[in-house]
């Protein structure tokens, strides 16, 4: 009438009923194992995704240790010479050898480095060659007083427009794209750095270790205009910054400063 399974079930039931403590701890262990297994699986996936994302952001934002300071100087505006911000120009250490090669080729030996950069044609050719060879750079802007991003953007755009070729629709489109992607609705506090970095073909804007915007810099047009604004021609945005940069570039060109 009753099979083997029935007697086995009855035996186990009677045996466990006399040992309630064992039943309790077995249940706790089972539940605990279930609880631990599920979060560990989710945590592992989340951690992997987070680390991958942070690694990509790290390359675009927190790569100051890969950068080398070329020079710095103050930016003054208006006939009153109001000191509005300090600028620092950086390149990646791995690009120093490339810079050396290009300067050796492009600088007019009769003029020297400084006068070559002051010559509109030669200086523009040097900057174009550096960008064509994928030199990556960063501009660090440190305001001397509280300001807003709208005011900074206006100054940057006017500087870019002053360097544009006449009737060049591609440059006009690039400057318009910069204007539309640069944030305006926030404050840039005194002595708090705003970075603008060229990463690949992306021109990124970084503030307080967060990317606040970027644009695709087609053919490095915006980068070219920015660098010319600080380095090329008889008048630049900061003569002291250009002098500082040229001192370093001269050492790189001479081979006395190589990594």
Swiss-Prot record:
Entry GO MF terms: heme binding
A Gene Ontology term for the protein's cellular component: mitochondrial inner membrane
Protein name: Uncharacterized protein C18G6.01c
Organism of provenance: Schizosaccharomyces pombe (strain 972 / ATCC 24843) (Fission yeast)
């Amino acid at each position: 009438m009753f099979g083997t399974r029935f007697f086995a079930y009855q035996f186990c039931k009677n045996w466990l009923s006399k040992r309630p403590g064992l039943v309790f701890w077995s249940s706790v262990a089972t539940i605990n194992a279930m609880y631990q297994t599920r979060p560990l699986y989710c945590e592992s996936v989340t951690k992997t995704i987070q680390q991958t994302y942070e690694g990509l952001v790290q390359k675009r934002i927190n790569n100051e240790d890969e950068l080398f300071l070329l020079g710095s100087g103050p930016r003054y505006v208006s006939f009153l010479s109001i000191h509005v911000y300090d600028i620092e120009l950086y390149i990646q250490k791995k690009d120093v050898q490339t810079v050396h090669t290009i300067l050796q080729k492009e600088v007019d030996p009769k003029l020297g480095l400084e006068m070559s950069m002051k010559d509109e044609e030669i200086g523009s050719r040097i900057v174009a060659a550096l960008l064509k060879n994928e030199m990556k750079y960063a501009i660090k802007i440190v305001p001397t007083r509280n300001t807003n991003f709208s005011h900074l953007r206006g100054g940057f755009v006017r500087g870019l427009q002053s360097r544009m070729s006449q009737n060049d629709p591609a440059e006009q489109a690039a400057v318009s794209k910069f204007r539309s992607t640069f944030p305006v609705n926030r404050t840039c506090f005194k002595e708090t750095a705003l970075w603008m970095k060229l990463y690949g073909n992306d021109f990124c804007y970084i503030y307080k270790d967060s990317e606040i915007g970027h644009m695709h810099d087609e053919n490095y047009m915006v980068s070219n205009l920015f660098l010319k604004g600080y380095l090329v021609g008889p008048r630049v945005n900061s003569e002291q910054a250009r002098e500082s940069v040229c001192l370093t570039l001269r050492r790189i060109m001479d081979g006395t400063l190589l990594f």
